[in-house]
Regions:
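Bacterial Sec-dependent N-terminal signal peptides
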Residues: 1-21
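Mature catalytic domains of secreted/periplasmic carbohydrate-active enzymes
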Residues: 20-429
Length: 429
């Protein structure tokens, strides 16, 4: 197995950039496979911006001077935060990993760091490290933990070139100092917190500068070669990265305008979306996605060989609002019943159809019918292998099918349908 993984690394993972080549270790390749198996994750945006109830970009959108914004730390005291509740929320929803903001664009660190006093332990009356509690609880409950980390910083004086969205920032910073600061924090996150499996970078898109990824990625993989690195730069994968992400779009789509240059590479894929229209807590955003829409996003992502990372913004007191818990309880019940067709699957290579998608695991194909076709059957083109059996996943009842040279017809007459996703399991030889 180890030799096979190393060979995969040389064929798929090694990306040449100049004279340097990143070759992932066997442990890293195994972590990639496990990442793809998990399929469903929880994204959490939480910080002092949550107090204002207007999303994580409130400092920018409301043009709040940095010195004024920093005062929010004086009032941030999330006494209702409970790491166990967060982790169990994810588990009950069928999620296998959590990605949480360790530091967002406002520069405030949500963990105890020695690299800056502007952090939740030193700058707030809370004086505790919620990410340490979360990391420990994730280990206890068997949930993987990834840290979101912002590359840009709206407040630090050494953030080079200043920032056009914050009044009073110097035109020039100390780029070497800023890179050193990030490396110090990343070292803390990887070495201090138990069970960390990934780093999720964001903010590259603000400036066309040398982010010193060779140093930063090299440091991370030196500290822990199995750590998975992803970067929300909206570009094709770069040297040293281990998975590719897509923001608010499925791989290959560009409805948001973010993914115009995101050519799909050979790395594991992940797409992220919000449960309403905001990443951070927004008290006026009531545009909650239905459980059916979330299930469809999860299924469509899996059909395109991608994970689905669903975001919530907890309230400033640390609690998750009931609208989220109610919706995700329904999603979790569906995933518990139909997880065989999601977890551990890969995209079948068969293009998405008007009625749905197909996932694959071993010799089984899972036909996800999410939109009822006009005719009493679905047609599956380009199917390799001979189908020996077709059955409804929900109860194992037989489903009629006919295989021809051009594809397979699966007949839906008399099949008990699911309002979210009717899944038919095809077994091939």
């Amino acid at each position: 197995m180890i030799k096979k993984l190393l060979l995969m690394g040389m064929l798929l993972g090694a990306v040449r950039a100049g004279a340097q080549t990143y070759t992932p270790t066997a442990d890293n390749l195994a972590a990639r496979q496990n990442f793809q198996d998990m399929k469903f994750g929880l994204f959490i945006h939480w910080g002092i911006y949550s107090e204002l109830g207007a999303g994580e970009w409130v400092m920018n959108e409301k043009h709040i001077p940095y010195d004024s914004y920093k005062r929010l730390a004086d009032f941030f005291n999330p006494q209702a935060f409970n790491a166990h509740d967060w982790v169990m929320f994810a588990k009950k929803a069928g999620m296998k990993y959590i990605t949480v903001t360790s530091r967002h664009h406002d520069g405030f660190s949500m963990f105890g760091t020695k690299a800056s006093p502007y952090n939740i332990v030193d700058a707030t009356p809370y004086h505790k490290d919620p990410l340490m509690e979360l990391a420990q609880e994730c280990v206890k409950e068997g949930i993987e933990l990834h840290f979101y980390y912002s590359l840009l910083d709206w407040g630090r004086k050494d953030y080079a070139y200043g920032s056009p969205i914050v009044d009073g920032k110097p035109a020039n910073g100390d780029w070497d100092s800023y890179i050193s600061f990030m490396k110090a924090q990343l070292t803390e996150l990887i070495t201090k917190y138990p069970g960390v499996k990934g780093i999720w970078f964001d903010g590259h898109w603000e400036r066309d500068v040398n982010w010193h990824y060779d140093e930063i990625y090299g440091l991370i993989h030196k500290l822990n070669p199995a750590i998975l690195i992803g970067n929300n730069h909206h570009l094709a994968p770069k040297e040293g990265e281990d998975f590719q992400m897509f923001e608010k779009d499925l791989p290959g789509a560009n409805t948001t305008g973010f993914s115009g240059k995101s050519k799909i590479g050979a790395l594991p894929l992940e797409t992220c979306e919000t449960i309403n229209n905001s990443w951070g807590f927004n008290i006026t955003d009531r545009s909650f996605k239905s459980s059916k829409r979330i299930i469809h996003y999860l299924v469509n992502a899996a059909g395109l060989n991608a994970n689905f990372l669903l975001n919530i913004g907890p309230m400033p007191n640390g609690k998750i609002q009931p609208e989220f818990t109610d919706t995700l309880a329904v999603v979790g019940a569906w995933v518990q019943k139909n997880g065989e067709a999601i977890y551990g699957t890969r995209g079948s290579g068969i293009p998405a159809q008007p009625w749905g998608v197909i996932t694959q695991k071993d010799k089984n194909l899972y036909v996800h019918v999410m939109t009822a076709p006009q005719q009493p059957y679905v047609f599956i083109p380009q199917l390799k292998g001979k189908v020996t059996k077709a059955a409804l996943l929900a109860d194992g009842s037989a489903v009629k099918f006919k295989q021809q040279t051009e594809g397979v017809f699966v007949y839906l007459s008399g099949v008990a349908t699911d309002p979210n996703d009717t899944i038919i399991k095809l077994t091939t030889n």
